[in-house]
Amino acid sequence: EGNALFLEALGRYLEAWLAELDLALAEKRVALNEAQLAAAKAQEAQGQATFKDVLEAESALAEAKASLFAAQNARALASARLERILGRAVAPKALPLPQDPPSLEEALAALENRPDVALARLRLEEAEAALAQASRDRALPQGSFSLSLAQGGLDLSLSLDLGAGALGYALGYTALGAAEGTSLRAGASLPLFAPVQEANQKVLENRVAQAKLALEAALKDGELDLRQKHQARLLAEAQLAAAETSLKAAEASLETAKKRLQAGTGTRLEVLQAEVGLLQAQRTLEQAKANLLQAHYALMDAMGIDLLGGER
């Protein structure tokens, strides 16, 4: 299905984009831990730190390098997955956020557009049509019409079954004693007791009942799915707003650290720490955007919208 392919490709793209950010954050953390280790060694030489402080800084640096190695592998794996699904290498970037999200009322109004609901309704219509046809066939009388003509030993007869719509004929020849004349016969029958037709009627009635239950279930499940996905989108929007606030705070912290460094009241280490905090806030923001994108398109899919722009 096109929508499933779109959602999978979107997930792989966002995975690769976030892996790029994770790598940049891991590199910055290594730089920070290297600076912290250098500071610890300098403080130890001045008697302001202990050897234990140096060991802890070395351990933190080793962990940061291990995280960097893991981030490099994760980025390579995410890039390979993205290339496999797209068929070519792509450098991921931030995607624009969707505009004009649907309201809950608009989402629920699209319930009939869902493929599962449409399929359940189609099956009900087919079952009802089959039952109606069987009821008509059982109620219609079975009629027949026949015409026979004998002339000079030649016998010709025609018959018409009105119920089946079948026309038959017969041609015969009698050498001796042939009677001449014409006869016309017509008849009709109304089935009062037809066990086979009644059994078939029951089967079709059961199919209609089952189809109605299936449609009701599809409508209930579809409404619940739409409500859940709409709620998930609202939650993603709230998380995005919180991430934007955190980013502003991180930007302010970095600006303060830079001003303190210029004024001689701060250190380069404080600036590095603020830069790491800013990268972390940016990573959190991009994760929130990715969650919003996936929640939005999952809602569009639940509404029965073709994400590739065609017709479902």
Where are these regions (language model features)?
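Sec/SRP-type N-terminal targeting helices
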Residues: G2-A4, E27, K52, E56, ...
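Periplasmic alpha-helical coiled-coil/stalk elements that build and connect Gram-negative outer-membrane
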Residues: A4-A118, R123, K229-A232, A236-L240, ...
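Active/binding-pocket-proximal capping segment
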Residues: Q151, E205-Q210, S246-A257, G277
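Gram-negative outer-membrane assembly/targeting C-terminal domains
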Residues: A295-R312
